[in-house]
Amino acid sequence: MKRATKQRLSLAAIIVLLLSGCGNVGKETKKQEQQVLRVGIDSELSTADVSLAMDNTAADVMSQVGEGLFSFDEKGEAKPALATEKVQPSNDGLIYTFTIRKDAKWSNGEPITANDFEYSWKRTVDPKTASPQAYYFEGLKNYRAIVDGGKSKEELGVTAIDDHTLEVELSYPMSYFQQLLAVPAFYPLNEAFVEKTGKNYGTSAESTLYNGAFTLEGWDGTNNTWSYVKNKNYWDQANVSLDKVDVQVVKEVNTGKNLFEGKE
């Protein structure tokens, strides 16, 4: 009971976070005639690696430059994103089979496949990764044995059946599972790019690959400014109104007020 309650609370918190991040950009988009938006946030970006993101800013950034099988609508409900549709689980509620969009691409033009999800999820639960996001996968088959060292990460309940079919097996029924899949921890990762980049993956804009509405530019891993630039390879780019969003870390209220009044 405690485990289920913890998961529901965590999911509720992340929904509020993602809606506050994505929602603000979306609402401003409708109001602005210009194609460039400037926003302020209250803390630095610690990482662009979905397996390691653990704070509010990182989760917000992930939601702008990445996308999973589902995303949250304005009411906080899960809607299909990289998955073509919501699905019904098996009769016992343990197996979900998702179809991946065939027009989904990474920012480098490579297709997004079911393997990108399998690789990402197994990387996150791997004890060697030491991911603060691993607990989100608690409901997947063999999760507990993997994090305890009794089983290999390869035995996690997720399998790429083919390039566009992903099968997920749970340890117990979770009525909110498809809602959970909108959380950044469940975003895909391009295995070839991550392995080539190694430990540098997600430490700067250049060492990260994107699949969301925007790509990240101008972030070197330590600076307080960066930009979201419209991803030309995003499958739904026709519905992305902004060309660019300039972000600046503003920790002091008065500083933010001065920047606003100075139109910076």
Task: Describe the residue ranges of each PLM region.
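Surface-exposed binding/hinge segments that line
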Residues: 118, 133-192
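Short, well-ordered beta-strand elements
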Residues: 33-43, 95-98, 117-120, 166-167, ...
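Short helices/loops that flank or line small-molecule/ion binding pockets
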Residues: 109-111, 116, 254-264
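C-terminal motif of bacterial Sec signal peptides marking the signal peptidase cleavage site
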Residues: 18-21
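Bacterial signal peptide processing site
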Residues: 23-26
